[in-house]
Structures are given as structure tokens and as C-alpha cells.
Amino acid sequence: MALMLVLLFLAAVLPPSLLQDTTDEWDRDLENLSTTKLSVQEEIINKHNQLRRTVSPSGSDLLRVEWDHDAYVNAQKWANRCIYNHSPLQHRTTTLKCGENLFMANYPASWSSVIQDWYDESLDFVFGFGPKKVGVKVGHYTQVVWNSTFLVACGVAECPDQPLKYFYVCHYCPGGNYVGRLYSPYTEGEPCDSCPGNCEDGLCTNSCEYEDNYSNCGDLKKMVSCDDPLLKEGCRASCFCEDKIH
């Protein structure tokens, strides 16, 4: 069975009374949000890792994330197009297929607040069961804390023709939100229980550079060994990353 992704976006709006006489200041703020700046990259990565290590319930197999240049190029290209919808998969693929979170606002929100807004969907989420109410979005949260994601990068653009003219795009590699375990984005347990000897400040460091193309690779591997060329090609993470998080 091929893996299927669930994608969502989020928006934030300030009232008109707070939008007056701020254009020049906001242009400067937008420059300070540029993810070409090392300090901004560090803010984004540190915020993600801080949130990943403080999930509730605690997780045993969440990887530490790092910045990825190729993912940044893809995220910034999509932000620059100002198309307020998710990019096609081929536009967010590096050596891995990447997930995507989107955020739109009528003001230049800080990266930390954008990522926090995604994470705050956890308030409407019950681990293992899903949203507390019908129609509530939780997919941004589950992507932020997806266990096997270990590369992250983001881009931002000003889109003057859009009602919400600030467009934020983050790519997560490999992507999460797979149908089948959408509401279990990580394994519940004590931090790093799944990665003994490969732990840094509560997050695992034994990432896998490959990914599986099928959701049942674990079962297939038990039935047919990785000596089978088709299994080896379609289930590369299961075959080559036995002691790594994937």
C-alpha cells in the first residue's frame, strides 16, 4: 500500500485598527524574517527541537531536526510564487519526499510564533485518537512532531495581491502525516528510549537517509527478505536503517 499524505494550512489576521501606519516598519521586519540569515535558521531549528522534546505524552523516538539547504530552496521557491495552496510533491522533493506546513498572515509574524501556532493545534488533539472535535485541524502539529522528520527548512515571501500578504512555507524531510498513523506521530515513551546511545538533550540522533515507499514494509520484510530487489528498492529505510529511526 502506497503512503498517503494529509496536508493543511493555517492563517492569522490582525484587526484593521492595528494595521495602520506600519508598512515601512513591516518591510524591515520581513527582511529580518529572511531564512537566508543564519540567526533565523537557528531560531527555526531551535524552536522545532524545543517543541519536539516537550511533547505530551513524551515520545521515545523523536529525531533532532537540522536545517537543510535543498529543502530551503524548494520552500522559498514556493513561497515566492504566492500560490496559497500546497505545492505538488515534486516541488518539495530533495533526496527525500518532504511534508509541508503553510501559514498566511496580514502582518509579519515571527517564525517562533508561526511554529508555535502550528504546535498549539495539540490543544485540540488526543494522542492516538485525533481531533477532539470534528473539523478541527491538527495536521500542522503532527507534522511538527513527526518522529522520523530530521531535516527542516522554511521560506517567507510578501504577496501584495493576496488579502493575507505574508506567506510562510516550511518543508519537513522526510514528510509525516501518513494515513494509517496520522494520530500517532511518534512512539509514546520516555525520551530516547528507542535510540539508546544516540540521544542528545532528549531527542534521537540516529536518523535514516532513506524512506519507505510503502506503509507495510515492516510486514513485507518479514515475509520476503531484503535480498529481494523489489523489496530493497521500495523499502529502503526498512532494509538499510534497521537500527535507525524511520
Swiss-Prot record:
Residue ranges annotated for the ShKT domain, each copy included: 208-241
General function of this protein: This protein is supposed to help spermatozoa undergo functional maturation while they move from the testis to the ductus deferens.
Protein name from the UniProt record: Cysteine-rich secretory protein 1
Keywords of this entry: Disulfide bond, Glycoprotein, Secreted, Signal
Post-translational modification summary for this protein: Two major variant protein D and E differ from each other by their carbohydrate side chains. The N-terminus is blocked.
Induction: By androgens.
Subcellular location: Secreted
Species in which this protein is naturally found: Rattus norvegicus
GO biological process, one term: sexual reproduction
Gene Ontology CC terms, in alphabetical order: extracellular region; extracellular space; specific granule
Tissue: Secreted by the epididymal epithelium and then becomes associated with the sperm surface.
Main location: secreted
Boundaries of every SCP domain copy: 46-172
Gene name of the record: Crisp1
A Pfam family per the record: CAP
Signal peptide: 1-19
Family designation: Belongs to the CRISP family.
Keyword Glycoprotein carried by entry: yes
Lineage per the UniProt record: Eukaryota, Metazoa, Chordata, Craniata, Vertebrata
Cysteine pairs bridged by disulfides in the record: 192-199, 195-204, 208-241, 217-235, 226-239
InterPro entries (alphabetical): Allrgn_V5/Tpx1_CS, CAP_dom, CAP_sf, Crisp-like_dom, CRISP-related, Cysteine_rich_secretory, SCP_CRISP, ShKT_dom
Glycan attachment positions: 32, 147, 213
